[in-house]
Regions:
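Flexible helix-coil linker/hinge segments at domain or subdomain boundaries
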Residues: 172-177, 196-197, 207-232
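Short, conserved phosphate-binding/catalytic loop or strand-edge motifs used
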Residues: 181-191
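Acidic, metal-coordinating catalytic segment for phosphate/diphosphate chemistry
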Residues: 17-31
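Catalytic palm subdomain of template-directed nucleic-acid polymerases
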Residues: 190-204
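Long, well-ordered alpha-helical scaffolding segments within enzyme catalytic domains
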Residues: 39, 155-174, 202-217
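Glycine- and acidic
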Residues: 25-29, 144-151, 191-195
Length: 232
């Protein structure tokens, strides 16, 4: 195994040690880690406002998109001392008992974004709430519907369900719906909430709307998240 190539740099007054900038991350395009970092810098004005205040979970591809990836929630050991983090209790069960405390990274400026890009964190996952105190949940500012088609359904059927859901949301008074692709063939519909709402209220509302859609289109929609129920 060849030794790591380290490059020292400074981003907005904060020192960073970058590694293996010539490593190919996207083989088909020949994009290297340096290209990924450059891309993150270019999209930062649009990306950072969406990440600000939200604990971030990474999907990392250290050997490129053709190799295995992994999720990372806990802040990596050796993270720079200036990186802002937040400790969030992970809760389980009906009683909401805290079973673990996870220290997440907060990606809120160029330096922390470059740090994440250097880890080959090609996916940045954030919750629908912003942290208002150390680890406490703020009210939700977004409601998300995840449309995940089961075989043999494809993106075509997924788009049809998205249109039905758009109509259901319109009937419920939500005029703004922002779709985006998710995974290889899924869709997510983002619904901005203004004013913000408590998480329990948002979850109950989303489940109710999903069940209504299932009731209207039982041949095409399943509101339960169990994968074995997604029969095309």
């Amino acid at each position: 195994m060849s030794p790591e190539k380290r490059t020292l740099t400074e981003v907005e007054g904060r020192r960073l040690s970058l590694s293996n900038l010539d490593k190919v991350i996207y083989p088909d395009a020949g994009f290297t880690k340096a290209d990924v970092i450059s891309y993150y810098l270019h999209v930062a004005p649009v990306l950072l406002p969406h990440l600000a205040g939200r604990p971030v979970t990474f999907t990392r591809f250290p050997d490129g998109v053709g190799a295995p990836s992994f999720f990372e929630k806990h802040v990596k050991k050796g993270a720079p001392p200036w990186l802002r983090t937040v400790k969030v209790p992970r809760r389980s069960g009906d009683a909401g008992r805290a079973v673990e405390v996870i220290e997440y990274a907060m990606i809120e400026d160029l330096a922390s974004l470059v740090w994440a890009a250097n880890l080959a964190a090609l996916e940045l996952h954030v919750p629908m709430w912003r942290s208002v105190r150390d680890g406490s949940f703020g009210d939700f500012d977004t409601m998300v519907f995840d449309l995940d088609p089961g075989a043999p359904a494809s993106m075509v059927e997924c788009c049809a369900v998205a249109r039905w859901l758009h109509d259901v949301l319109g009937d419920a008074g939500f005029e703004v719906v922002c779709p985006k692709t998710s995974g290889s063939k899924g869709l997510q519909l983002y619904v901005p909430l203004d004013p913000r709402r408590p998480g329990d209220e948002v979850r109950a509302l989303a489940h109710g709307l999903a069940r209504r859609l299932e009731r209207d289109h039982p041949e095409a929609v399943v509101s339960n998240m169990r994968r074995d129920l997604r029969k095309g």
